Amino acid sequence: TIMLDAGHGGEDPGAVFQGRQEKDDNLKLTLAVGEKLQDNGVDVLYTRTEDVYQTPFEKAQIANEAKPDYFISFHRNSSPDANQYAGAEVLVYDKSGIKYEMAQNILGALGEAGFDELGVKERPGLVVLRRTKMPAILVEAGFLNTEGDNEIFDNNFNMIVDGIANAILGTLDMETVEEEPMYYRVQVGAFRSRENADKLLYELLDQDYPAFLLHDNGLYRVQV
C-alpha cells in the first residue's frame, strides 16, 4: 500500500505564479500517478483528493494512522525570483534504505521527462519526512515560478506521470526480488468471464491455496 500526498491545499495554495497555484498542480499530479499505480495493482491511499487544507502534521498523522508501506508527497518548487532556478529534486529524511532507491529512480524519471536533475537531497527538518513512521519521500516536480519548468509540467505531463509510476513500481519489484528470491507463481486459469475466474479462485481459497486474481488484456487470470 502506498499513500500519496498532494502538498498544500485549501487556504494554503503553496507557491503562486501568474495565477497558477501549486496546490492544484500537486493534486493533478498525485491523482494521475495514483490512478496509474492502481492500474498496475497497487493499493493507493491519499491524504486528500479534493481542495482541502491540512497542516503537514495532519498529513503525517493521516499516514501514521493508515500505516501504508510508503508515503510520497508531491510538490512544485519555487524560488525567490521568477525564472531563477529550474529542475526537479527529490527530498528524503536521510540517504538510506529503499526510500533512497525510490527517490533516485523518481528523479531519473523526471530527468527523462525533460527536467534538469537537481539531485536527491536530505531534508530531515521537513515534518512529512520526519514524522512519518514509514519510508517517505517528497517530490519537487520543477519550479512553479519558472516558465520553462511549467512548460515541461504541462506538455510532458503524461510522460511525467508514467515515469514516476514506473519508478515506484520498479522499486517495489526490486524490493520483492530482494525479499523473495525463490518465489514463483503458477497460473492455473485464464478466463474472459469474471464469474468463472471467481469460481476457481474461491475453490482454491477454500482448499487453503494462496490464490489471487489478476486482470489484464481483457483476461482474468487466477494464480497461486
Predicted regions and their residues:
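Short glycine-rich His-centered loop
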Residues: 1-19
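Short beta-strand motif preference
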Residues: 4, 137-139, 222
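Short glycine-centered, acidic/aromatic-flanked micro-motifs in structured strand/loop junctions
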Residues: 6, 48-49, 92, 188-190, ...
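Short, small-residue-rich loop/turn micro-motifs
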Residues: 6-8, 75-78, 140-143, 190, ...
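A short acidic, helix-capping loop that chelates divalent metal ions and anchors anionic groups
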Residues: 12-14, 147-148, 221
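Periplasmic OmpA-like peptidoglycan-binding domain that tethers envelope proteins to the cell wall
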Residues: 16-23, 224
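Active-site-proximal helix/loop segments of hydrolytic enzymes
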Residues: 20, 24-180
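Solvent-exposed beta-strand motifs enriched in subsets of small alpha/beta binding domains
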Residues: 179-224
